[in-house]
Amino acid sequence: MANVEKPNDCSGFPVVDLNSCFSNGFNNEKQEIEMETDDSPILLMSSSASRENSNTFSVIQRTPDGKIITTNNNMNSKINKQLDKLPENLRLNGRTPSGKLRSFVCEVCTRAFARQEHLKRHYRSHTNEKPYPCGLCNRCFTRRDLLIRHAQKIHSGNLGETISHTKKVSRTITKARKNSASSVKFQTPTYGTPDNGNFLNRTTANTRRKASPEANVKRKYLKKLTRRASFSAQSASSYALPDQSSLEQHPKDRVKFSTPELVPLDLKNPELDSSFDLNMNLDLNLNLDSNFNIALNRSDSSGSTMNLDYKLPESANNYTYSSGSPTRAYVGANTNSKNASFNDADLLSSSYWIKAYNDHLFSVSESDETSPMNSELNDTKLIVPDFKSTIHHLKDSRSSSWTVAIDNNSNNNKVSDNQPDFVDFQELLDNDTLGNDLLETTAVLKEFELLHDDSVSATATSNEIDLSHLNLSNSPISPHKLIYKNKEGTNDDMLISFGLDHPSNREDDLDKLCNMTRDVQAIFSQYLKGEESKRSLEDFLSTSNRKEKPDSGNYTFYGLDCLTLSKISRALPASTVNNNQPSHSIESKLFNEPMRNMCIKVLRYYEKFSHDSSESVMDSNPNLLSKELLMPAVSELNEYLDLFKNNFLPHFPIIHPSLLDLDLDSLQRYTNEDGYDDAENAQLFDRLSQGTDKEYDYEHYQILSISKIVCLPLFMATFGSLHKFGYKSQTIELYEMSRRILHSFLETKRRCRSTTVNDSYQNIWLMQSLILSFMFALVADYLEKIDSSLMKRQLSALCSTIRSNCLPTISANSEKSINNNNEPLTFGSPLQYIIFESKIRCTLMAYDFCQFLKCFFHIKFDLSIKEKDVETIYIPDNESKWASESIICNGHVVQKQNFYDFRNFYYSFTYGHLHSIPEFLGSSMIYYEYDLRKGTKSHVFLDRIDTKRLERSLDTSSYGNDNMAATNKNIAILIDDTIILKNNLMSMRFIKQIDRSFTEKVRKGQIAKIYDSFLNSVRLNFLKNYSVEVLCEFLVALNFSIRNISSLYVEEESDCSQRMNSPELPRIHLNNQALSVFNLQGYYYCFILIIKFLLDFEATPNFKLLRIFIELRSLANSILLPTLSRLYPQEFSGFPDVVFTQQFINKDNGMLVPGLSANEHHNGASAAVKTKLAKKINVEGLAMFINEILVNSFNDTSFLNMEDPIRNEFSFDNGDRAVTDLPRSAHFLSDTGLEGINFSGLNDSHQTVSTLNLLRYGENHSSKHKNGGKGQGFAEKYQLSLKYVTIAKLFFTNVKENYIHCHMLDKMASDFHTLENHLKGNS
């Protein structure tokens, strides 16, 4: 090779005169020349070998240690790809052509980048992700600027109706791409132990300089990736922007910027944040010596900020609704009011970057099912609800049909004027058996009319199975009479009835329900075994002579296997009623003596056929029949109904409250759904009297008629008894009685299969009873771990019944049945409206159940109610509308308030429009979004930086003048439940990203494994060893968890106003309105996340997160610890500061400290304790603080870094300075100083305005505050993590003792007790 002299340029690379060494004409062949130099060989390579007449070469230098440096900085160049090793200038700490340091490393191929956005864009070459689809042609792009260029060139700047969030999966990949980047299979890196399936992993010391990859989603891959200028905020207005005229319908928030410089000052709110401008180290008595160095890196924004006006188009800002809309109370006629324009600009001064940050989502798809979001949506046009729409076209659909019958007063459709009265049940109950004489039987039937029940048809026997309670298609008059006004103005109305074109086979549904009622016998059996073991132990300890007790006593202690089948009569157990339970007058009147006797009659029927060896239909465990179940008195049953109405219905209003005030006739009309044909009944009576169906037993017919009346009321009383303190055993017995009655109905129905039954109603009472049965089984399961197979079987039976009965009748069929010229749905009576609305609510409730089990317990099953099932149903009406109607009222037409389907209603929020959400629908919409948009970047309500969209859509201001106190209270409870659920799901999203088997471990009671793999800071520490994105996701989940936990205990409302000028301490009580079955399980995970943060912070303190620690300490000291230590003082004996505070509260000034006078004690300890109790957590201020942390970390990935080695021992100030008044309100004051009475650090006049100044001040003045003692860690000084474990354990114990007898709470309290032992063992 020829030697060429290489003058050096400023970059350090030798310069070669290529024109003197090579001639022109490199045609399609790669040219190489190696030149010998004094220091290292140089390789010249053509970088464009496929192009003609190319004189462009790359210079590659080999260093003495064998490393390669090249002048070609193109990551995808063929030259760099053909090298054996990646050039050093493209690796970590290499330099870009502009001289910037490459500090962001790809964990797949080790290539490094100077900007994080470049790394994230590079990851798409491994994942083939193209997150920017064209709304017209579905072509996908890796960057948004490419999408805009495409739209400008191909579609004349038109982005289509919508920028779809779906990402089309490539079906074909070119052969060349298969052999290159597309063949790289990228897997999300796993963190933590290799056997738990986590997505976190141990990282090296430079982890903070790496960005976590996005989810592994298969996308189409561009054929060629080239370097383009970043579409940043500074160039957004001029870079590849199409004509604005073609984009008028698209708001600016749909353009996502690559790396916006987020401004933390936009989050500042002086009113919320003013109390945090004090020295936070004084609150913790913390001294920082001068040798303690802390990383104080602030984000370097280079003076570049983003100044955008976040505005929606005028048409969007003026988006109002007609009078039929539920939002008219919010918008009204004044479109210039504040609420008339729903956009995010009203929330904060700069809202665009909040959306940009929320869209910058780091997530891992957790669904193993095909999400509806992954399906093509182009065939279905998105319909924004027009609130004037009603049913206009009555067309057939695949799943249901509309049949129209003109009411022309014909004899066929006219109900007989001499319609028989309802049955007198008291007389029916006096006849235990019907005579065998045919004439006597006929007389009884005609006298009582058998409840007008169509359970037994007079048609000939058939081998086909026609289940009466599930048949939808044979109704002569529809159960829902929708009045459709004739447009010509005539008086003739049309009765619209629902029917099935293709009725499904109902036999399987009935079998599942019967099997379900058998399964839940295990609850009663497990309870009896526990009671028997308990009584056996008591008997053994009470006497040394093991003598058998007389028959008048309770059970023998030999076990259930030794119980005879004879009835053992015993008295009810003595109740340990809590005297704190408020007494109230009984309001419900549903139960009376005739109904109680009806319950007893069905129970006797159950026992009779269970004991009869020839009758095996009940299939009951004979050992369980040895215990006689005593029906409570009428007054007790009505009291349980009151508890059900006050504690269950406000959270789950699936049953109309007026049902609890019905008489027996009205209840019968409700169970029959107000629809029967008198002529058909007459035909039935004739066939029965003629003996056509000789094999049919009339006693069975009685049981069918009676059991459907009493089943739902008894289930309601059972659930209400859960809230009766001290009645645990009676609750289990009530549930067993309810189960037997339900089982009697189902088995008797199945027994009558040989008789063709013509029951045209969907039996809403049955679905409501099944829901209550399932909920009770969930909360009262006595097994140590939840039986997932039992839950699946029960919920599968419920979902199958609802899918067969409810879904066809409540489907809106939005594509064919709704248009802008329609009128609202109208019902002939309030009862018909309530039944129709109840079916919608039961369906949504079943959907919520399925999502709850899937999210919180990792229980999935094929027959669950899925998103596609609820998308087409009508949404429920507002609670004010629901409560205003009554089952008792009759004779007036009722119009449905909301008549648009679930899917279109949800998607109407995706464009920034906010309008009223029906309160009961809120939870279902949150579950729908959580499951639908899992693993995607687009969210409506579940944003990492909370934009309060959900809260604003659930605003209750319109209900202020209703003069309906009870209704308004229930509305507030439903809204709170929706917000609590949103916070819980935001926490669950992070937990499932960390460990997908986490919820399964909780379900199986494996708290020890959770501690080892998740809570143990030695093995997993988010503040030390993990990427900034993982830490930010953790802080997001922590923020929402703190919101929930801070609302568990509240001050009494009367105290809030009276205590302003009163020295008395506040009175705090359990917030019962925030408690429900769904919420309690979410609180469990919220406590787990808070404890995890405290453990990590105590192990490796990060002082930029010090404020979170202080706020959690304020929450514990001011509310949680004083309340729980008063109830359970022995549990806090290991915390001297808690004992000190509680003794002071109890004895006021009676406790003196040795060596001090009473005056000194009062002036010192009293003031300090009251100051400590007065420090409340500032939830909104803490949320602003965490959001600022997220913004700074987004701009600077090293913002939260800590220097090594991390120090965990500090000198806490315990000096002798006296307490004096501060010139400003001290929200972050010092600890109560339980090491002594003088509380140091409180009177220092130096006050800082940020954590940064706090730390500097602590270092400069550490010599003043040092006590010369041994250093302490945060865990040793405050024991805050251990305190919160104890708080969690006692909270669930307190809820069980004072709110609901739920065995699920025992499991939760037991988990935290186990965790408490782990922490104490490691301390």
From Swiss-Prot:
InterPro entries in UniProt: VerF-like (IPR051059), Znf_C2H2_sf (IPR036236), Znf_C2H2_type (IPR013087)
GO MF annotation terms: DNA-binding transcription factor activity, RNA polymerase II-specific; molecular adaptor activity; nucleic acid binding; RNA polymerase II cis-regulatory region sequence-specific DNA binding; RNA polymerase II-specific DNA-binding transcription factor binding; sequence-specific DNA binding; TFIIB-class transcription factor binding; TFIID-class transcription factor complex binding
GO biological process, any: positive regulation of ethanol catabolic process
Phosphoserine PTM sites in chain numbering: 54, 230, 258, 299, 323, 325
Primary subcellular site in the record, as a coarse category: nucleus
Signal peptide: none
Recorded superkingdom: Eukaryota
Outcome when changing residue 109 to Y: Suppresses activity
GN (gene name): ADR1
Effect upon mutating residue 122 to Y: Suppresses activity
Alphabetized Pfam families for the sequence: zf-C2H2
Function according to Swiss-Prot or TrEMBL: Required for transcriptional activation of glucose-repressible alcohol dehydrogenase (ADH2).
Cysteine pairs bridged by disulfides in the record: none
Result when mutating residue 114 to V: Lowers activity
UniProt-listed PANTHER family: MIP31509P (PTHR40626), REGULATORY PROTEIN ADR1 (PTHR40626:SF28)
Subcellular location: Nucleus
GO cellular component, one term: nucleus
Designated name of the protein: Regulatory protein ADR1
UniProt KW keywords: Activator, DNA-binding, Metal-binding, Nucleus, Phosphoprotein, Repeat, Transcription, Transcription regulation, Zinc, Zinc-finger
